Every structure is written in structure tokens, then in C-alpha cells.
């Protein structure tokens, strides 16, 4: 049972039976898109800022925290007891996403941190720190989740995806998703990603002998992701 559809998160899950998934691992829109690049600033000096213009799918008129909350509720419904959900989110929305997960019923909420070993510098005196990390929140349905490790500090260090093989602006590195799936599920388990993007989660699940269910709404990304899954 490997399923990949071109549809939205809620439409996919509304057709799923409850308690049929072992692990949710997903990277929804951060809702941070805005124009950037070379701009005139103080005293006419031009400075460069890394683009956060990811696309229409990442804008508040097309996706909101309320929309994410509906998906989180469905994650809880389709997860088996003792299942785990890992949801990537914007650094500045951690507390809001945590509340969404708590409201849905998730317990043992923890933070996972991806440290980028080759971050893109921001090159700005006003915002001088590099974009060197991203955050995911982990929640458990009921208790006693699958955890294939004796210890984990929740910090993962991997480089960002190189241009070769990268076509999605927020594409996560394969080794990161592989590590998360390996630790939080077992062979034969079902992994769900309802914001599949480049389908990296689904590919890692397949290679780890897990089953996968996923979807991607954007037609261009869906077609490219489907090719990667072949």
C-alpha cells in the first residue's frame, strides 16, 4: 500500500479510516513568503536578503494556522495509538503550533532541531545571523511511541539540498527524513506526509521498507515528485 495523490491535506485524510497510520512526518507551509532581494535601505545602501518568496501556496490568503490546525486534528484521528506526529514549522510559530497539537490531543510534545551545516548567509547588517536551523515539533498519541534509539537529543546536523536534484524551495535533505523515519517507525509501518513537496519523506519511507501515504496539491511539484518515486 503506497499511495501518492495530487490533492490537499484534508481531502486526503477525510477519506482515510481512523488509526491507520504509524508515523506522520510532514513539512507544511510556514506562511512566511514575502518579496526580498536587493533593496535600497538606510542612506540608499543596497543590501541582499535571502529570498523567502516560496510561492502562492505559502501565503496567508492560501494557507493559515487555522488550516494547519484542521490537519493536525486529522493527524491525531488517523494515527494509531502510540503513533508519532512530527510537524515542521516556522521558528516564530512554535508556541502556536504546540497549542494546536495539544488541543488535538497530542502528548509528550518535544522539539526537533535541524542544524544546517552549510546555511545560506543573510549578508545583512540588520539581520546578520545565517538561516542555520529549522524546527519540528513531535507529539505522541497516548503514550509509549516507537523509538529505535537509546538516546536522542533531538538535534540533527545535515547540509541543505544542493541544486542538483532540488526543485522545491523548502525541500528537506533526504538523510534528515531518513533518520527521523528510522527512529520513529518500524519496517512495515505506514508513514503519512500530506504536504509532500518533493516527496523526500515518501522516498525515505519506501527505502526503509515502510509503506507510505502522501499528497501534494501543486501540480508542478506533484508531477516531479511522482517521477522521483518511480
Question: Where are the regions a protein language model picked out?
Answer:
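Core catalytic lobe of class I
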Residues: 1-214, 218-222
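Conserved SAM-binding loop
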Residues: 225-226
Amino acid at each position: 500500500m503506497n499511495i501518492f495523490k495530487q490533492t490537499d491535506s484534508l481531502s486526503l485524510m477525510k477519506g482515510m479510516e481512523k488509526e491507520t497510520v504509524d508515523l506522520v512526518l510532514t513539512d507544511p507551509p510556514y506562511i512566511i513568503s514575502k518579496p526580498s532581494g536587493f533593496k535600497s535601505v538606510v542612506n540608499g545602501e543596497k543590501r541582499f536578503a535571502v529570498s523567502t518568496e516560496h510561492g502562492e501556496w505559502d501565503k496567508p490568503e492560501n494557507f493559515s494556522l487555522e488550516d494547519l490546525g484542521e490537519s493536525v486534528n486529522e493527524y491525531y484521528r488517523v494515527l494509531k495509538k502510540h503513533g508519532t506526529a512530527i510537524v515542521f514549522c516556522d521558528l516564530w510559530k512554535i508556541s502556536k503550533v504546540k497549542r494546536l497539537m495539544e488541543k488535538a490531543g497530542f502528548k509528550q510534545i518535544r522539539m526537533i532541531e535541524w542544524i544546517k551545516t552549510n546555511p545560506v548567509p543573510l549578508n545583512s547588517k540588520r539581520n546578520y545571523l545565517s538561516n542555520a536551523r529549522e524546527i519540528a515539533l513531535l507529539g505522541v498519541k497516548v503514550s509509549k511511541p516507537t523509538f529505535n534509539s537509546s538516546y536522542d537529543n533531538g538535534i540533527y546536523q545535515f547540509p541543505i539540498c544542493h541544486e542538483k536534484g532540488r526543485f522545491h524551495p523548502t525541500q528537506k535533505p533526504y538523510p534528515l527524513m531518513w533518520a527521523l523515519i528510522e527512529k520513529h517507525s518500524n519496517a512495515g509501518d505506514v508513514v503519512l506526509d500530506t504536504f509532500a513537496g518533493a516527496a523526500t519523506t515518501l522516498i525515505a519511507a519506501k527505502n526503509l521498507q515502510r509503506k507510505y501515504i502522501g499528497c501534494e496539491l501543486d501540480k508542478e511539484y506533484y508531477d516531479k515528485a511522482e517521477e522521483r518515486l518511480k
